[in-house]
């Protein structure tokens, strides 16, 4: 989720409490830039149920970046991932060269920070860019199993490429959309030990809440229920597995919650 979004401003605690009431015990506020990472860390330090990441979203790659701030956020135990980073070929701006330059700069720094002892998993943003992005990630030398392709909206062929690379895949409310059957088919392909769910809120409200704006972390329950249906599992069985996966991938504490 993106708890730092302006649509949540002033009601962040209310959003977290609503999620807790729905059974969502922990969440990660994903950063889109260096200033946003600092704001996400402040939320995470104020509430033990919230964690954060540190990175630059490709659609923010033409904005000012303070690499020292990203590094400082990354030193906090409340920061559990680098990113989100990657490439977005759906929009023309920022231009492809700028996106690639910032991606390369981030990966280079993550390699260096990992060598310093700040090894963290990496949240990847990929939109219409899987074939272009995978060689870049491979060339970084970072372990494939430390990457998660978040908010996956591509079809089975791209999902197979990501899985062959060795990365994880995370799905949003898009798997509940009747007009996105290819994404549900991708979800069917992903092994249960390499899958996660998310909201990407305030965006992409899942069915049956699709008309609700903004999307909120509490609605991740609907995403998990749809993934359970795709795999023919009881929701509570899959939800326990998803908790285990998030704990294992992000190093989250095990609080015993469903």
Where are these regions (language model features)?
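Mid-domain alpha/beta scaffold segments of enzyme catalytic cores
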Residues: 1-258
